[in-house]
């Protein structure tokens, strides 16, 4: 990803990929996602989960491989096929990541076409994919314009765009530790993670410190 996009830090990209694989898998492995998943004896309400259908997944240039891994895993867990529209500037690394998950899934018994992608990516192709009548759900991660386009397709969409994350340092905090943690977080993968801190708000009594 670093070589193809020219963005980020190799070591941190590796950490994100491992987090996407291990943490996501461990957090959902015991969740029931199909069939009866809950029943309330008092209200008599039974909650039943069912696959939604084909998922359109758009991924960013900033976190291409980890996003591809994450979205593939949650699609497989919910028994939905997924078709990716990768960012054109991160096509090769994204395909490589998706192939690893796809091949492992097929080896475990998943359908052959459970994970697919647009071979020649473009913003126009991603738009066609989002608006395709066969798509049931959109998972859009990227710039604000693309996320807004996903929300405008007239079908269920979950969008993640650029964040404006504030960090609040309270008067009871260990200021040196807080500053160090914020710097470490903000500098992770050269600051590409959209959830990293963008602003710091200080409690007035410690502002000078």
Question: What does each of the following model-derived ranges do?
Answer:
Residues 77, 147-209:
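ALDH superfamily catalytic-core signature
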Residues 120-124, 144-146, 164:
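Short acidic loop-to-helix transition motifs that present clustered carboxylates
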């Amino acid at each position: 990803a670093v070589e193809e996009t020219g963005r980020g830090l190799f070591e941190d990209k590796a950490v994100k990929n491992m987090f996407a694989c291990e943490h996501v898998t461990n957090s959902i492995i015991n969740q029931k996602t199909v069939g009866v998943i809950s029943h309330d004896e008092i209200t008599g309400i039974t909650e039943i989960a069912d696959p939604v259908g084909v998922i359109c997944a758009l991924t960013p240039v900033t976190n291409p491989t980890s996003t591809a891994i994450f979205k593939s895993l949650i699609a497989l867990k919910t028994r939905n096929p997924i078709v990716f529209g990768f960012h054109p500037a991160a096509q090769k690394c994204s395909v490589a990541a998706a192939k690893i998950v796809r091949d492992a899934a097929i080896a475990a018994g998943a359908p052959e076409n459970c994970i697919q992608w647009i071979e020649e990516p473009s913003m126009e192709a991603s738009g066609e994919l989002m608006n395709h009548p066969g798509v049931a759900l959109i998972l859009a991660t990227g710039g604000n314009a693309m996320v807004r386009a996903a929300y405008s397709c007239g079908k269920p969409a979950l969008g993640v765009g650029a964040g404006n994350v504030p960090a609040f340092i309270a008067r009871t905090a260990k200021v040196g530790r807080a500053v160090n943690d914020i710097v470490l977080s903000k500098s992770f993968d050269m600051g590409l993670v959209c959830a990293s801190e963008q602003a710091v708000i200080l409690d007035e009594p410690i502002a000078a410190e």
